[in-house]
Amino acid sequence: MVIVYLAIACGLGALVRYFFSRYNQASKLPLGTLIANLLGCFLIGVFYNHVESKEVYAILATGFCGGLTTFSTLNDELQRLLSDKKVFYSYLTLTYIGGLVAIFLGILL
């Protein structure tokens, strides 16, 4: 039954990411993907520190946050931003450093 809940949670996370993706058209920086990835990292930190059940953690962190965050879209967007080095490096730094900070902030809560 955990697999079913995990799949549902993944779909819900992907749906949330889809709504954030609307912000990608309004900015040079893909803000929707950045927000989705940082939120997913933060939530993984929160779940890591506050969810005791391994099954519930798997559903929330692997399922929901796995569907919410996106490594492939991030790298596709980075490839598209290569022509503007300043935006490229800003996005790369914000995503990876911001992701680590977000996880630690989630753990600290």
From Swiss-Prot:
The organism of origin for this protein: Streptococcus pneumoniae serotype 4 (strain ATCC BAA-334 / TIGR4)
Function comment? Fluoride-specific ion channel. Important for reducing fluoride concentration in the cell, thus reducing its toxicity.
One GO BP annotation is:
cellular detoxification of fluoride
Give yes or no: UniProt keyword rRNA processing.
no
Residues binding Na(+): 66, 69
What membrane topology was assigned to this protein in its record? Multi-pass membrane protein
Q: What family is it from?
A: Belongs to the fluoride channel Fluc/FEX (TC 1.A.43) family.
Q: What is this protein called?
A: Fluoride-specific ion channel FluC 1
Q: Name one GO cellular component term.
A: plasma membrane
Instruction: Please write the reaction equations for the catalytic activity of this protein.
Output: fluoride(in) = fluoride(out)
- Show the Pfam families listed in the entry: CRCB (PF02537)
* TM region(s), chain numbering: 1-21, 29-49, 55-75, 87-107
